């Protein structure tokens, strides 16, 4: 049985798309621009239901996480105006944090204490 060349090309293209697309989505998700002092980031997890980014860390000492959040992934706005993210450490809302805002992303600095292991950043949309 000889396959039609057009059908063969379509099969190859579909297979290639299936390999490429998951890695593109994983790259967007895994490649947050961040730095951490006093610990290590273990994983990032998006919670679409609660419009939040969950961050698991291993906090070995008092430190801080500086993370750049692309607006295409998570943002906090009321209408067209920026509003503050709600930031939680182990379920307790952080009263203040430093933030730098650009048209494309928002960079926030979250201080943490030793043994804090769970951070969440809640926006208004993802």
Task: Give the positions of each predicted feature.
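Intrinsic-disorder/low-complexity, polar/charged segments enriched in Ser/Thr/Lys/Arg/Asp/Glu/Gln
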Residues: 52-54, 62-66, 107
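Transition segment at domain starts
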Residues: 24-58
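Short strand-turn-strand beta-turns centered on an Asx-Gly dipeptide
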Residues: 89-92
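Surface-exposed beta-strand/loop patches in extracellular or lumenal glycoproteins
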Residues: 58-83
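Short polybasic amphipathic segments
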Residues: 33, 85-87
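C-terminal beta-strand-rich structural cap/linker in extracellular carbohydrate-active enzymes
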Residues: 101-126
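Secretory targeting signatures
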Residues: 1-27, 87, 126
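Short, isolated positions in well-ordered beta-strands
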Residues: 42, 94-95
């Amino acid at each position: 049985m000889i396959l039609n060349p057009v059908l063969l090309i379509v099969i190859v293209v579909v297979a290639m798309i299936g390999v490429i697309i998951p890695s593109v989505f994983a790259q967007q998700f895994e490649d947050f621009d961040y730095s951490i002092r006093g610990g290590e980031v273990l994983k990032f997890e998006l919670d679409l239901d609660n419009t939040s980014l969950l961050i698991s860390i291993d906090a070995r000492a008092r430190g801080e996480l500086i993370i750049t959040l692309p607006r295409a992934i998570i943002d906090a706005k009321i209408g067209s105006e920026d509003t503050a993210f709600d930031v939680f450490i182990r379920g307790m809302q952080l009263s203040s944090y430093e933030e730098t805002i650009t048209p494309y992303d928002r960079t926030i600095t979250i201080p943490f204490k030793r043994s804090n292991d769970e951070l969440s950043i809640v926006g208004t949309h993802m």
